[in-house]
């Protein structure tokens, strides 16, 4: 490895076995023969590299790119490949170094080695078809080559974390324990130390992703295969290079396509494959086939572009390790005797500071560069933090990724403070973000770098506010880097909390409690009362018994129990009597006492308590403005127990004030919390004032890196997209095999959307498409798709989508990724698909008939007799089309006409009579059989009621569920012609709670009245079931709130 960080690691793996050949004695005796004897003119023309990794000179000057004092490691790689004019080649010095000790005093060992080589009947031959290979005779050399010292000390422990000391070694691997059984040892069969062992511990490098046995790490160091360089030495006299060279690594498995020929890599039997199929760069991620027609010699020396994320990667040429200065003997002799101990101590402190930071950053300014610092809290989100840390090390320079469990962010921010256009990504919860913002305040960086958030764990209200979502699922890190790079910089208000003793109370009346808050600055909220009391109980219990709080589910259960207990005890009921709140000179105490608030929140951002919006949208209330996180105002909100409960279903608290300064006085010890950190504060006077504004990165909906959105001509007016659904079982088992997962998907239908349609809008159209398909898939109409290859029609899935379905991103090269529902408005349809959309349904039941032909289907409709007039092209177009624009096809009037066109009919066929009899008698098996034989679910009984009316009245939940799954959607709210009652009215009158829940979950109307003006809730109350009435009322209120929020958002 030279000072510029060159690295061409191409030699630790053996080439494919060639035909057996008897070696010549002269070439087999010395490493020179191994290097020059096999490197012929045709071999050089093929661009192959041959050398003996066991030789010391080969380690330093060969194609592996090892350290070289002259700084020509990469250049030697080229000489070794071409052969050069000198017949001894790149390994000549190594050969001489090994032959001289042999001729000097080890004649017997040399003869023994010669005899061993003569008796050998098999020898590997360099393949001319391979671009990068080696001779493969290194395993015949002595375990410790002649001339090299044998290490007698204890085995070196594999390094798992970066070394930031002055002893750091460039190109050192970061080994992580792994249990991957499919990856073969990187050394290959010839050099693997435990090749005959059935099972051995393995390690995987987090930076270059090679896998070796733990026992083989020492052998890997002997052949000097280095990881990609992360810095450069500061003492080198060689001129500084402003570019980075490729770091080539052999791969037995490789995703994507070859950069040269555009073809995929052969991986049909990759699990057990021992052949090297690709050569890829650890920096730019380019990959080539391992053959001369694809990977050529000039690729070794060419500069690396650092790939798609070059703008955020910190190149190793920027990071310099400073050598400790050494005093000469003359200078030490001329030192004068010190007379001041104080001065000596000061110098010692300076030396300690210099020793702790032997690295400096010397960036090259460029307006296109946005270098990124990543801080990961591994303790957030269970094991998510550790996985995210490893993924960022693979995509970026490991020296720009920091583990907050090892050290805080201060040293890293201090080291990178002079880097222009710096951006920061905080991977953790809101507390991690606050920690980084406080350090930025302390360092007073100018300009302050903006901070993005990758939310881990739960809560994450600040991340939700900045459009990063409520938690990380499995979104590709590559897309996250693009989003951080293209994100919009916004400001976030930060507020000071100044605490003093309450001057109105004498010291002897102060109660027990702490005298200061856990934080003196907050970014999200500051609250007191009920919510802080519950959080405080949880923290105190966890500190007393930490072993009982090792599960997220247990933590949630404790929170729920503590909240319920506090509700019964009403410990915060007298909060309004012991506080005084003054906002910008306005005393809010009388209003607080009148409404008897049990919780008061000072809110800076719109989100609170894991995504709720307590301020809501003021709408017509002209006294208040919509909430913003950058307006210099803080919102004051009061909560009663009722409004706190309504908060979870879309409600909001009582808006009190929007102000710039708050004066809060407490007259007893009250539980409080600052950004989730609770305490019980003694009576105090708290002053809240604006501190400053921090720069944050907000996830942008329109990403500038997408050429689709930059070029208006590339955005089509309309897109015709097929929708396919995938079960959770198939997703978990096949998400790394896109072809098999595509084959396992089941088609839903076809949508026609606008070119700029986002996923949030697309979700509504998919739900409508599902309703139409449910209507058409009744007994009289069956929808099929046609296999493009076999032309055989097969029935579409009639199973309803569960409310928990989500979109899948199918554009990544390696696998499918789930998209968080809260971030659907940030993604366009064109960003996740080209001609088809995949959705994941976690509750989908996989049947034996489930499956999809390899070709994508087209919809074909099998018409039933008597309905040819109803099934017309206009109606079919309405079923299949999703207009991303407002068209008449989905207007309310059309939907009403569509519903009334499916009128009930009297039973005609024998199968219709059988279905009616099965519903009346509660025979589910007979119902299923009659429906499969062609019976219709749109028939009426003697009382002019639908089948769903009869099933709801009898209380047979299985039959109700079957009709809901297979019948048309209009059956839900179809009214009885005599009484005007729906199926939900019937179930409420009979007090069938399970049936009522099925109907409500299916979307039955809760506000539709019968001929007497009664709703289902009122019918349940008249039937003497107040619990059922309360349930229906709560569901009705929930839907009303959801509807109001939808209108507000629009």
Swiss-Prot record:
Pathway: Lipid metabolism; glycerolipid metabolism. Residues 332-347 have a biased composition (Basic residues). Disruption phenotype: Homozygous knockout mice lacking Dgki do not display overt phenotype. They are slower to habituation to a novel environment, but have normal levels of locomotor activity, anxiety, and motor coordination. They display a small increase in presynaptic release probability and synapses show a reduction in metabotropic glutamate receptor-dependent long-term depression. Residues 367-502 form the DAGKc domain. Its EC number is 2.7.1.107. ANK repeats lie at residues 943-972, 979-1008. Diacylglycerol kinase that converts diacylglycerol/DAG into phosphatidic acid/phosphatidate/PA and regulates the respective levels of these two bioactive lipids. Thereby, acts as a central switch between the signaling pathways activated by these second messengers with different cellular targets and opposite effects in numerous biological processes. Has probably no preference for any of the diacylglycerols in terms of the acyl chain composition, especially for the acyl chain at the sn-2 position. Belongs to the eukaryotic diacylglycerol kinase family. PANTHER family: DIACYLGLYCEROL KINASE, DIACYLGLYCEROL KINASE IOTA. This is Diacylglycerol kinase iota. It comes from Mus musculus (Mouse).
């Amino acid at each position: 490895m030279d000072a510029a960080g060159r690295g061409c690691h191409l030699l630790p793996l053996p080439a494919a076995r060639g035909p057996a050949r008897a070696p010549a004695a002269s070439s087999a005796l010395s490493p020179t023969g191994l290097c020059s004897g096999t490197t012929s003119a045709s071999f050089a023309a093929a661009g192959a590299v041959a050398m003996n990794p066991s030789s010391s000179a080969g380690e330093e000057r060969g194609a592996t790119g090892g350290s070289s004092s002259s700084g020509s490691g990469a250049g030697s790689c080229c000489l070794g490949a071409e052969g050069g004019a000198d017949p001894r080649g790149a390994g000549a010095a190594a050969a001489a170094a090994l032959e001289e000790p042999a001729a000097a005093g080890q004649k017997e060992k040399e003869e023994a080695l010669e005899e061993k080589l003569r008796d050998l009947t098999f020898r590997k031959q360099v393949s001319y078809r391979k671009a990068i290979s080696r001779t493969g005779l290194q395993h015949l050399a002595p375990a410790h080559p002649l001339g090299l010292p044998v290490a007698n000390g204890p085995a070196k422990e594999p390094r798992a974390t970066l070394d930031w000391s002055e002893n750091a070694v460039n190109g050192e691997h970061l080994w992580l324990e792994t249990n991957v059984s499919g990856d073969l040892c990187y050394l290959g069969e010839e050099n693997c130390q435990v090749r005959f062992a059935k099972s051995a511990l393995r390690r995987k490098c987090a930076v270059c992703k090679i896998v070796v046995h733990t026992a083989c790490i020492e052998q890997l160091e002997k052949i000097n295969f280095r990881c990609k360089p992360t810095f450069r030495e500061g003492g080198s006299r060689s001129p500084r290079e402003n570019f980075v060279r490729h770091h080539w690594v052999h791969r037995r498995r490789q995703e994507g396509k070859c950069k040269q020929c555009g073809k995929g890599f052969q991986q049909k039997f990759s699990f057990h494959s021992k052949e090297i199929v690709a050569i890829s760069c650890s920096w730019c991620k380019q990959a080539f086939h391992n053959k001369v027609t694809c990977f050529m010699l000039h690729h070794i020396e060419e500069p690396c572009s650092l790939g798609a994320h070059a703008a955020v990667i910190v190149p190793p040429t920027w990071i310099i390790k400073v050598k400790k200065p050494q005093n000469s003997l003359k200078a030490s002799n001329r030192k004068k005797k010190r007379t001041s101990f104080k001065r000596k101590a000061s110098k010692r402190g300076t030396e300690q500071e210099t020793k702790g930071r032997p690295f400096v950053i010397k960036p090259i300014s460029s307006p296109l560069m946005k270098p990124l610092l990543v801080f990961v809290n591994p303790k957030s989100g269970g094991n998510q933090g550790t996985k995210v840390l490893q993924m960022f090390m693979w995509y970026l320079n490991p020296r720009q990724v920091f583990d907050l469990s090892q050290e805080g962010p201060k040293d890293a921010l201090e080291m990178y403070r002079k880097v222009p256009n710096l951006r920061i990504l905080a991977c953790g919860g809101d507390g991690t973000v606050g920690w980084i913002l406080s350090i930025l305040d302390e360092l007073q960086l100018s300009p302050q770098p903006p901070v993005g958030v990758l939310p881990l764990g739960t809560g994450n209200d600040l991340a939700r506010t900045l459009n990063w979502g409520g938690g990380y699922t499995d979104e590709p890190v590559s897309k996250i880097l693009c989003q951080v790079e293209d994100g919009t910089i916004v400001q976030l208000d930060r507020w000071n909390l100044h605490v003093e003793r309450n001057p109105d109370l004498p010291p002897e009346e102060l109660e027990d409690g702490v005298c200061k808050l856990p934080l003196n600055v907050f970014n999200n909220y500051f609250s007191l009362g009920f919510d802080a009391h519950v959080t405080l109980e949880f923290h105190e219990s966890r500190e007393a018994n930490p072993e009982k709080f090792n599960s997220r589910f247990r933590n949630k259960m404790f929170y729920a129990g503590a909240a319920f207990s506090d509700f019964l005890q009403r410990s915060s009921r007298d909060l309004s009597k012991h506080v005084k709140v003054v906002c910008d000179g306005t005393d809010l105490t009388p209003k607080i006492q009148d409404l008897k608030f049990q919780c008061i929140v000072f809110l800076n951002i719109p989100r609170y308590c894991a995504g709720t919006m307590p301020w809501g949208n003021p709408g017509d209330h002209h006294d208040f403005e919509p909430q913003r996180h950058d307006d210099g105002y803080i919102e004051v909100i009061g909560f009663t127990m009722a409004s706190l409960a309504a908060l979870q279903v879309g409600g909001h608290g009582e808006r009190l004030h929007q102000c710039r300064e708050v004066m809060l006085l407490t007259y007893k010890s009250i539980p409080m919390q600052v950004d989730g950190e609770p305490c019980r504060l003694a009576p105090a006077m708290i002053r809240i004032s604006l501190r400053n504004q921090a720069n944050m990165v907000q996830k942008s909906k329109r990403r500038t890196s997408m050429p689709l959105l930059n070029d208006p001509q590339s955005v089509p007016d309309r897109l015709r997209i097929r929708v396919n659904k995938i079960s959770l079982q198939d997703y978990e088992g096949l998400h790394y095999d896109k072809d098999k997962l595509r084959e396992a998907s089941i088609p839903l239908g076809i949508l026609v959307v606008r070119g700029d349609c986002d996923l949030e809008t697309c979700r509504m159209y998919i739900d409508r498409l599902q309703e139409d398909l449910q209507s058409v898939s009744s007994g009289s109409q069956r929808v099929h798709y046609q296999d493009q290859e076999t032309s055989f029609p097969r029935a579409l899935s009639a199973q309803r989508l569960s409310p928990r379905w989500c979109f899948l991103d199918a554009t990544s090269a390696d696998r499918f990724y789930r998209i968080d529902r809260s971030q659907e408005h940030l993604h366009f349809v064109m960003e996740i698909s080209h001609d088809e959309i995949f959705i994941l349904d976690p509750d989908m039941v996989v049947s034996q008939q489930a499956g999809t032909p390899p070709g994508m289907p087209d919809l074909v409709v099998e018409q039933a007799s008597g309905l040819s007039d109803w099934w017309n092209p206009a109606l079919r177009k309405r079923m299949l089309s999703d207009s991303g624009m407002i068209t008449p096809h989905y207007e309310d009037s059309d939907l009403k006409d569509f519903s009334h066109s499916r009128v009930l009919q009297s039973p005609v066929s024998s199968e219709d009579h059988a279905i009616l009899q099965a519903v009346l008698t509660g025979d589910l098996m007979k119902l299923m059989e009659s429906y499969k034989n062609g019976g219709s679910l749109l028939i009426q009984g003697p009382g002019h009621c639908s089948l769903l009316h009869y099933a709801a009245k009898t209380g047979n939940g299985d039959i109700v569920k079957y009709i809901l799954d297979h019948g048309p959607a209009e059956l839900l709210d179809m009214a009885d012609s005599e009484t005007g009652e729906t199926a939900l009215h019937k179930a409420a009158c009979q007090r069938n709670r399970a049936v009522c829940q099925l109907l409500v979950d299916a979307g039955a109307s809760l506000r539709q009245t019968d001929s007497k003006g009664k709703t289902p809730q009122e019918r349940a109350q008249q039937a003497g079931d107040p619990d059922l009435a309360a349930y229906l009322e709560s569901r009705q209120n929930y839907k009303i709130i959801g509807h109001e929020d939808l209108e507000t958002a629009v």
